Each structure stands twice: as C-alpha cells, then as structure tokens.
C-alpha cells in the first residue's frame, strides 16, 4: 500500500508555504523578541494596502498634493482611516524594526552562519528609510517641503558633481513639481522592492534557521512553526493591533509634526527643520559634524556600520545572554541611541551640539572599539573559567 503525501506538501506552490510557515523547524527556546519579524511583515502589508488606496485619490502635482491629502481626509469614504493607518503604520513599522535590530544586536543574530540574513536585513532598513523619506515629502506640508530641500541638498556636498546632482534630483532650481512627482513615483515603487528583498531575507533565514536566546545550535531541539509559534505570533499581533488602533482612532497625530498641516511654502522657513521621529538619531549624527561632506559621510556610515559587526565581534559565544560586560555596554548603546533621537529634535545650539558630538562618538565606538575589545576580554574570561574547572 502506497502512502499518499498531503496536498500541502505535494503541491509545488503550497509546499513552499508549508516549508516556511507550517513545518519549518524552529528552536524551542525562542522568546517573544523573535515575534518582531511577523509584526514587520504585518506592517509591510498594512503600508502597501493602504498606500495603494491612497494613491487612487492622491495627486502628485505640487499645486494639488496638499489639497488632495485633505480631500482624502474629508471627502473620500473612510479616507481619514486609510490615511491615519498609513501615517501611523510608518511609525509602528520603525518601532518594530528598531526592536528587531536591537534583538539582533543583543542575541548576536549577525554572526556566522547568518551573515547573509543580517546583510539583507540592513538593505531592507536602508530601503525602508528611503521609502519613509519619499512618502513624507509627498504630503507637501511645510515640513515636507523643507525636509526635502535639506536632505536633497546633502548631495551638493559631493565634490565637483554635487550641485549638478541636486539640480537633477529637483528637476529644476528648487523643490518643485517634478521633484514631488518623481518622489511619489519612487515612493510607490520602493515598498514592492522591499517586499522582494524581504523574500530574500526569509530565504537566507530558511537556509540555516533561526538563532535562539541561548546562542547555541538549535538543531537538537526544534519544533514545527505551525501550532506553536504561529499561535505565539498571533498573541503579539493582537497586542500590536490594539496599540495601533489606539493611535489611529484616538491619537492619530501624536507621532506626526504639526507644521505639516500647513501647505508647503518656500518663502517661509520653519523655526526648526526636523524629519519624522524615526529618522532623528541619524539626523542628529548629520548635524553633529560641522563639515557638510563629513556630516553626510558620517550619517550614511552610521547605517552601514551595522555591516561590520560580523567582523568586529570576535566572541566565541553568540549573543549577550551570558555576558555581563556585553549586556552593560549594549544598554549604554540603546540609551545613547535614544539620546541621539532627543538631540535631533533640538535646535542647533549649546549644549545640544556638544552632546550630539559625544553621542555620535559613543555610537561609532560601540561598533568599532567596544564590541571587539569586550568580546576579546570575555573570550579570555570564558577560557579561564573553562580551564579552572
């Protein structure tokens, strides 16, 4: 008698879903910090779906952009809900993403054999920041206009060709109609690129499987994804939806900027030009360097420095679960990152400039100096502890 394989395993398409979402073996010890991946997937779906519906009513003409957003809010049925879901969805996307990155830093998810997973994740992070900036400009409020002006002007720091690049980006001599139209075109396109890179991220993860809080091989104790971790993910999905709904329905503008409810005016400069809260730490790093070119290089380096962790972390044990020194400096790093975000909101004046420069130094020191030094010290301590036994 021949045994018949279940349809979910025999079907060429369902077998992929089965291998990733149902029978995928996961370490039994993974905790709720591993739920951020599913929440990020939910955020991406929310952003793409709401974005498609917003694009049906949005006009990228600079004369109509701001008015079309107000039209969505006032005249389109449930337009206010779609717009607030999209705006707050971006903030929740970054909340989950920063938590996901912090989990990776704490538990050593960047170490071999998951270097590819980490690298692709950093690419997703960069693309998400680009999509967020482009979308913020599409509203064409006062902060959108000046944010677009300031950030695109950064390219003028490139020697010889910088000014030509800025004019090419603008499509004119200032942020104008061609700028907003091309920004909207790319803002619509980038999320689908992110979705494709997310699939690559999952493929790379599927090769070696998830890491675990203990930092040891999880091949000896794994359980299927469905029935255990799917239900566990649903718990955080419900908690996420409750918190998300509280912001969307009761406090939709808390995470935004009030100046963006004023139409963009190139003749009036705001008292303080700041991006959305999730870009503030990197904006603070940019402003902490007096030289324009060095500031731009430092800001981009602050993102790309995540890629050096697989090289600089020399620890023989993955993750910080059993490392006192690494835990201490990790939480110093988290506090410093939050401080950079607060500094990014302030005016460029004493003492915020000095604090920003010190925080920037600590930020880079963590990746380039602290992690390799602490990892080598802890390696010696582990060796001494093993020999003494």
Curated annotation (Swiss-Prot):
Q: Does the keyword Transmembrane helix apply?
A: yes
Q: Mind telling me which InterPro entries this protein's record contains?
A: Cyt_b/b6_C (IPR005798), Cyt_b/b6_C_sf (IPR036150), Cyt_b/b6_N (IPR005797), Cytb/b6-like_sf (IPR027387), Cytochrome_b (IPR030689), Cytochrome_b_C_euk/bac (IPR048260), Cytochrome_b_N_euk/bac (IPR048259), Di-haem_cyt_TM (IPR016174)
**A GO biological process this protein is involved in?**
mitochondrial electron transport, ubiquinol to cytochrome c
Binding locations of a ubiquinone = 206
Stated membrane topology is:
Multi-pass membrane protein
Q: Which Gene3D superfamilies match?
A: Cytochrome Bc1 Complex, Chain C
Work out whether the entry's keyword set contains Flavoprotein: no
What GO CC annotations are associated with the protein? mitochondrial inner membrane; respiratory chain complex III
Purpose: Component of the ubiquinol-cytochrome c reductase complex (complex III or cytochrome b-c1 complex) that is part of the mitochondrial respiratory chain. The b-c1 complex mediates electron transfer from ubiquinol to cytochrome c. Contributes to the generation of a proton gradient across the mitochondrial membrane that is then used for ATP synthesis.
What do we know about how this protein assembles, alone or with others? Fungal cytochrome b-c1 complex contains 10 subunits; 3 respiratory subunits, 2 core proteins and 5 low-molecular weight proteins. Cytochrome b-c1 complex is a homodimer.
The protein depicted here goes by the name Cytochrome b
Organism per entry: Vanderwaltozyma polyspora (strain ATCC 22028 / DSM 70294 / BCRC 21397 / CBS 2163 / NBRC 10782 / NRRL Y-8283 / UCD 57-17) (Kluyveromyces polysporus)
Tell me what gene encodes this.
Answer: COB
